[in-house]
């Protein structure tokens, strides 16, 4: 657990206990899947707009927390007896939580259509457009550039420090509009540039569907 290992005042995550069909507590066997979504900034609003669609299929909670704060909150809640089957998050926040999570984590990943939509929106704002993605840039980006003969500056990041550096580099090169996840758009706007949010309701919906399916499969195998 990284910096938490060996820290006496911070408890480790409790171990998951598996039950067979005969011994599994009735509440666990019959309840809906429980999903916790950890997000920051604009992604919170997107999650809040989609989660009501799943009210009959799962118990989904949204936490406005990220990185160490999210890990600590989840640890404390689980030690207090709260149950959760799957985490959902995105980008660097999701990657960090996944490294420490005792349950599966599903990442909210922008679709090819999300990339094309966001770039088209950015191009309406300025011809000086850049995109910063978590990890490798989607293949659709190159297709978009070739199709329209556009020069779009692109960068990738793994950590928040990378994200800050990438956006600053783009703005120093005259980029006026930056496309990316909420962390990227927040940085761009703080630097006086326009930000276009990359994620969509469709991407969130897909991640929640996958999380619910993972929870159902895991409980069936317990």
Role assignments for model-derived ranges:
Residues 7-222:
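Non-catalytic structural scaffold of enzyme domains
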